[in-house]
Amino acid sequence: MTMQFLIASNVLLWLALIGCAVLMLGLLRQVGLLHERSSPMGAMITDHGPDVGDAAPTFDLPDHSGAMVRIGGPSALKRPTLLMFTAPTCPVCDKLFPLIKSIARAEKFSVVMISDGQPDEHQRFLAKHELGDIRYVVSAEVGMAFQVGKIPYGVLLDPEGVIRAKGLTNTREHLESLLEADKSGFASIQQFMTSRKHSHDAKAA
């Protein structure tokens, strides 16, 4: 009887331990999802790489059709350029693609998508999406030069090739914040709020 009780108690303890392990894994997954969703404020967060106000690194690279693309430097079309760092297997990038096209048309920007990955992955992406005037470049070197750590990531260049805004662009709001950061003249929301505070204090005085 005592032996049966010990066996039963050990079984229950093991079941409880397994249950705790499953619960812990579930909690860790939820924490990861929460971190993923709460991270980006888009272009209103500054990070590593060339700073806003710096001249962008320049590259001459072939696009998906073999035509050469100049990244950085003065724009031949005399208009801003939006560099979008993506990957063909990135689901967020895939969902964001129609928004990139619509914002590019509305704002009259040139758009260069800079991607990395396997050739067959790029072929599937290009077969699925109509690029229009968007140039598609495969290059890990460009991402390294801008020190892009997460995607989708946007960098806005003015017509002279100077970086005016940059940041993660997980949603339409993030893309819009990229444009607002450029229009407001601030690299981050922190700078914008500090400027507003100083302006308010000056008026109060």
From Swiss-Prot:
Name of the protein in question: Methylamine utilization protein MauD
Pathway(s) where this gene product acts: One-carbon metabolism; methylamine degradation
Naturally occurring in which organism (per UniProt): Methylorubrum extorquens (strain ATCC 14718 / DSM 1338 / JCM 2805 / NCIMB 9133 / AM1)
UniProt-listed Pfam families: AhpC-TSA
Function as written in the Swiss-Prot or TrEMBL entry: May be specifically involved in the processing, transport, and/or maturation of the MADH beta-subunit.
Keywords assigned by UniProt, alphabetized: Membrane, Transmembrane, Transmembrane helix
CDD domains: mauD
InterPro entries from the UniProt entry: AhpC/TSA, MeN_DH_accessory, Thioredoxin-like_sf, Thioredoxin_domain, Thioredoxin_ResA/DsbE_sf
Residues annotated as domain Thioredoxin: 50-184
Gene: mauD
Molecular function GO terms recorded: antioxidant activity; oxidoreductase activity
Compartmental location: Membrane
